[in-house]
Structure formats: C-alpha cells, structure tokens
Amino acid sequence: MTDVSGKIRAWGRRLLVGAAAAAALPGLVGLAGGAATAGAFSRPGLPVEYLQVPSAAMGRSIKVQFQSGGDNSPAVYLLDGLRAQDDYNGWDINTPAFEWYYQSGLSVIMPVGGQSSFYSDWYSPACGKAGCTTYKWETFLTSELPQWLSANRSVKPTGSAAVGISMAGSSALILSVYHPQQFIYAGSLSALMDPSQGMGPSLIGLAMGDAGGYKASDMWGPSSDPAWQRNDPSLHIPELVANNTRLWIYCGNGTPSELGGANVPAEFLENFVRSSNLKFQDAYNAAGGHNAVFNLDANGTHSWEYWGAQLNAMKGDLQASLGAR
C-alpha cells in the first residue's frame, strides 16, 4: 500500500508540474523569449551585411546577417529562439553581438527567420498562422549556406561553432552531432536537453502552436517517431564525447541576478529546463567527456540579459577553439 501511495503521489506531482508548464509555455516566452538587453543592437557603422542566400531545399532565398572576420576565418552561427522574427535575428535585436565580435577573427553569421523550426528538416510543410512554407533548415545551415559563404565571402566551411538559445540550444548540439567537421563547437544556452522524453513533445507542441500556430507533428511526426530521438541531445552524448566536440552549456537557476530578467515566466521556464541540463552534465561526465564548460550554478532567468553575458564570456574560448587569427 505504501508503494502504491508513493506512486500516486509521484504521479500527482508530475501532473502538477506538467499542468504548470503547459500553462506557462504558450504565450509567455515559449522556449525562446526573454526581454531585450539594455544595449540591444550593435552600434552603427559596423561592416554588417544583409545577405540573401539562395536555398534550393527551401525554395526561396534566406536572409542572413553577416559580419566578416577576415579571409578564411572560422564562423560562429548564432541561432535564434522559438519566436524568431523575419526582419532580424534575435541576437541582433537583443544584444550588440556584432559589436562584441568585431575584429575578433571570427565571422558572425545570423540566419533570419525559422520561427518554431528547431533549425531542423521538417517532414511536412511548416503550416502556421501566416500560411505554409518549407522548413529544411538543417540542409541550409550545413550545406547550402556554408558553401555559399565559402565561395562568396571566404568563410571557412569547416571548423565552425553553433551557438543557440532555448529552442536553438538543442539544435546547436544536434548540428554538431551530425555534422562534426563543420561544427566542432556547440553552445547551448537555456535549452531543454531531452525534448523527446516525458512531456517534452506535448509541451513543445503547445509552445509551437502559440509561436506561429505550428504543429510539432509536421516537424518530427508523432512522439513515437525516431525523429524525436534523433533530435534529442541527451541521447547523443556518446557522439559528442567521441568527436571531442567543444561544448559550452549554460542554464540559470531561475532566480534573477543584477542583470535583470525578473519576471515570473522567465523565472519559471529557466527553472523548468534546468533539470535536463543537470542530467546532461552528469551523463556527459559519466561518459568520459572532458571538453566542456558547464555554467549551471549561477542565478539567471530565461532572458537575453543572461544569454548575452554568456556569448561575451565564451568569446575567448571560441577564438581559441576555432583558431581565430
């Protein structure tokens, strides 16, 4: 009887957590959001280009914000969150990232668009409130875009980094798993690290529905489909260790610091994804991983103030790891 009662209580706790998460995710920061930092946008006069890069896979040209780090420079791909806009990348809207990385020897690449995409190749057309389009973001980021940048802007097509917030944190890790020569460095900031497990698929579906009206089943099929496991970083730790991919993993504890981000949605969501990051760290260490920075103990909420601070903090590590000159 005690065992049964314990199971009932545990199940009740899971239901309460799931209900709270389901209520919080849509309409809040949706695995992506957060308030802008005080220093949003870089100063005028920087050599930032607005490229239109053709994508046969997606049947259209994709806007890419770009700042060169010099001929044959390594690249840092800055990936946006669930609520990515079609005008500018969130890293540019909410931080002076181009200014921070000016003359760093690193080319900064910010693809624009891809709301709710997880930067993945979707099974079906991405149909939302604005209509239907083709999402083949993995193909674009790992084939079409690096080839175009190599041919037209002298950017190294290999030895790059992918850094993403929230939704795109897991995407950065997955890109490095399946394309280890291109992405030797992956930065994940405030991501849900086990999206295929537990209530992950359901909660992601709710958030995607709120952020553009998209369906998770159009992306990776039902939760039983292997695509969910393919795109789950926690299930690919052995590959990350074997490839010796350099990792930078950040997640705050849900408590705001002097940086800001003091609002209930951002606090709740950061605390919600935190446990998956702690489990990822434990599994990585158990697998013999030794090439990662884990920043999981500091105060921080699900907001740009903290993601910007992490991008600033990892600059030297990126330069050293990618061989910037």
From Swiss-Prot:
GO terms for molecular function: diacylglycerol O-acyltransferase activity; trehalose O-mycolyltransferase activity. The keyword Mitochondrion does not apply. This is Diacylglycerol acyltransferase/mycolyltransferase Ag85B. Disulfide bonds join 127-132. Substrate binds at residues 82-83, 166, 194, 272-275, 279, 302-304. It comes from Mycobacterium kansasii. Keywords: Acyltransferase, Disulfide bond, Secreted, Signal, Transferase. GO terms for cellular component: extracellular region. The active site is at 166 (nucleophile), 270, 302. It catalyses: 2 alpha,alpha'-trehalose 6-mycolate = alpha,alpha'-trehalose 6,6'-bismycolate + alpha,alpha-trehalose; an acyl-CoA + a 1,2-diacyl-sn-glycerol = a triacyl-sn-glycerol + CoA. Its EC number is 2.3.1.122, 2.3.1.20. PANTHER family: DIACYLGLYCEROL ACYLTRANSFERASE_MYCOLYLTRANSFERASE AG85A (PTHR48098:SF1), ENTEROCHELIN ESTERASE-RELATED (PTHR48098). Residues 98-108 are annotated as: Fibronectin-binding. It comes from the Bacteria. Residues 1-40 form the signal peptide. It is found in: Secreted. Belongs to the mycobacterial A85 antigen family. The antigen 85 proteins (FbpA, FbpB, FbpC) are responsible for the high affinity of mycobacteria for fibronectin, a large adhesive glycoprotein, which facilitates the attachment of M.tuberculosis to murine alveolar macrophages (AMs). They also help to maintain the integrity of the cell wall by catalyzing the transfer of mycolic acids to cell wall arabinogalactan and through the synthesis of alpha,alpha-trehalose dimycolate (TDM, cord factor).
